[in-house]
Amino acid sequence: MEQDRRYLRTQMQKENIIQKLKERGCRITIVPASCTAQQVLDTNPDAIVLCGGAGLEAFEQNPAWKETVAELIKSDKPVMGIDLGHQVMALAMGGSVEKMHCGHRGANCPVTETASGRTFITSQNHGYIVKEIPSCATVSHLNINDKSCEGLEYPQMKAMSVQFIPEAEIGQKNFDGIYERFLGLIG
């Protein structure tokens, strides 16, 4: 599919992510986090992005979100989670999330991509981590400092997620290749 024809849904708004996707020819529609999976899928998006929002506590107040996110991940649409979206996807697929004693905060957090062994300096601002990896996922990125999970891939589904902020990466200019890999999942 041509880049200018890509059409994505985002569950929650994050301007930098939106800008990076627009730079790649994506048309963006933002839907409220209160939408059901069917409401999102009825719009026939090419892909779905789950990103920042009110925080994990807000999701925990509405038990339906877990089912909604699981349905989206299990759909035939590619799904990418960034930051809070990473945590929400892991929880929806049976993983666990834990509050950190000291969060990952700053623009100099080293992360290794497990497939290539390459290490990147990332920007992070989170106080929770995915502790238990869902059985349907594999770790794609690890924090060098504490070996915590910074990214997951869901091999049986068209889904992936990262805890860090890919568009704010420092140094290597192509670490936002995460977007390219995600957009490559669109059929």
Q: Can you annotate each of these PLM segments?
A:
Residues 1-38, 42-43, 167-169, 181-187:
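RNA-binding accessory domains that recognize and position tRNA/RNA substrates
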Residues 5-10, 122-123, 160-164:
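Active-site-proximal beta-strand elements of phosphoester/diester hydrolases
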Residues 28, 79, 159:
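Hydrophobic anchor at the start of a short beta-strand
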Residues 47, 51-127, 172-181, 185:
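Cysteine-nucleophile active-site neighborhood
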Residues 117-157:
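Catalytic beta-strand/loop cores that center a nucleophilic Ser/Cys/Thr
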Residues 151-187:
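A glycine-centered loop/beta-turn motif at secondary-structure junctions
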